[in-house]
């Protein structure tokens, strides 16, 4: 709200009174918290038709970027081994199988994160 005041150079002076049930109040407050904004800002944005983007989405995206980087590095190591690069001569079959296991685990982690982002939106 402070940013809004600075951008417009004035304070908001009009207030809306909206009667709600206690469970509606709890749900609105929880939604505002998930979005990372105040209840007033949440209601103002929703009331003006803005789509609310949650903070959790950004955290999941950062986590996916990290996991994707890990997957790229693991894939690079596997590629070196498959091309018979001299730098990988010291690695045996057990090491490569462990690498493949890490790649599979990393893919599973990416799937888990994607489900955490997508499934809450699919539920009513």
Swiss-Prot record:
Pfam families: NikA-like (PF21983). Its main location: cytoplasm. It is found in: Cytoplasm. The keyword Hydrolase does not apply. Keywords: Activator, Conjugation, Cytoplasm, Plasmid, Transcription, Transcription regulation. One of its GO terms (cellular component) is cytoplasm. This protein is essential for positively regulating the expression of transfer genes that are involved in the conjugal transfer of DNA between bacterial cells. This is Protein TraJ. The gene is traJ.
């Amino acid at each position: 709200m402070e940013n809004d005041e600075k951008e417009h150079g004035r304070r908001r002076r009009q207030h809306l009174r909206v009667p709600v049930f206690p469970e509606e109040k709890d749900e609105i407050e929880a939604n505002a918290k998930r979005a990372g904004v105040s209840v007033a800002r949440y209601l103002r944005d929703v009331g003006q038709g803005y789509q609310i983007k949650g903070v959790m989405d950004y955290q999941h995206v950062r986590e996916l970027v990290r996991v994707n980087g890990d997957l790229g590095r693991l894939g690079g190591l596997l590629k070196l081994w498959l091309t018979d690069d001299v730098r990988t001569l010291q690695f045996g079959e057990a090491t490569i199988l462990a690498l493949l296991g890490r790649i599979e685990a990393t893919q599973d982690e990416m799937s888990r994160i994607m489900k955490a982002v997508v499934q809450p939106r699919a539920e009513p």
